Amino acid sequence: MTLRLLEQGLTVRRVPQAPASGVGALHRTVARRSGPLLCSGLLDSWPARTAWSPAALVERHGERRVTALLDLPDTGVLFPQDQRRYERELSFGEFVEQMESAGPSAPCYLAYQRAHEIFDPADCDFASLVPPDGHPTDTRVWIGSAGTRSMLHSDLKDNFFCQLWGEKSVTLLAWRDSRAAYPFPDNLVNSQVDLAVPDMRRFPRLKHAVLHHVRMGPGDLLYIPRGWWHDIRAHTTSVSVNHWFGRPLGVAQYLALLGVLGPEYWKATARDFVEHGLLRRTESTQFFFSPPSTGKRLYDALRFGDFSRGNDPSSS
């Protein structure tokens, strides 16, 4: 994907890598929120590095019931159907069988699962990496076949993305370049851009932004600062875990972005404020784990004092 981006004339830089003793550099980077940082091999001593291989997980948790996404599309930014159409309940062992036989054109994913609900969260030592700051944290597990994708999106909180098994690529874009991400008019945290096939006629501002890219292997940790856009793709069968922490982005940052995006975005926000806020109509779920629309989030900010209500993973 990096070569294709370069061929389109885009600027792509490697994510900086911490030295071998990377915890100190990681803490300094997190304190400054200066940008993404790769810490290679930082997780090699974690029990999860060996205990969370697909085979080991099946041996310990094969009978556990899970809800997975099967036969996912391999192209496009939005699901062609509501996400619920891809959901299936099955045993974890059955899911791993599906995952290992899935072709790249119909990947499957056990995604966005709280770690403590299915596996032993003590296998991942985030306490040594994140000093307590009074803000809720949340840890999620992502297990899937080659070809699984989390399209370009932005999260409210700082994120440690950890690769335990297999390989994934991550492409990032700074929050300050959010206009180049071309958010959906009704959803400021999801991008219309598919970085695998970037349409430069539709999205010309990409040429003026800087993308950052990294390929992750087992034992690697990637720090993603809050707000930074990121696109994640699996090259192989993969087991990942991520940990959100710290103070979330607030309503002021999103209002500032909304202000520069223009009338199309203001109109969509006003519509959804009424339709999904005041009238409480259900929103569609064609994004990957769809967050509330911007209008609904502004409604929540006014009514409940919480712009991230329903989108802060530590509270959902």
Show which residues each predicted segment covers.
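N-terminal accessory scaffold of Fe(II)-dependent oxygenases
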Residues: 1-221, 229-316
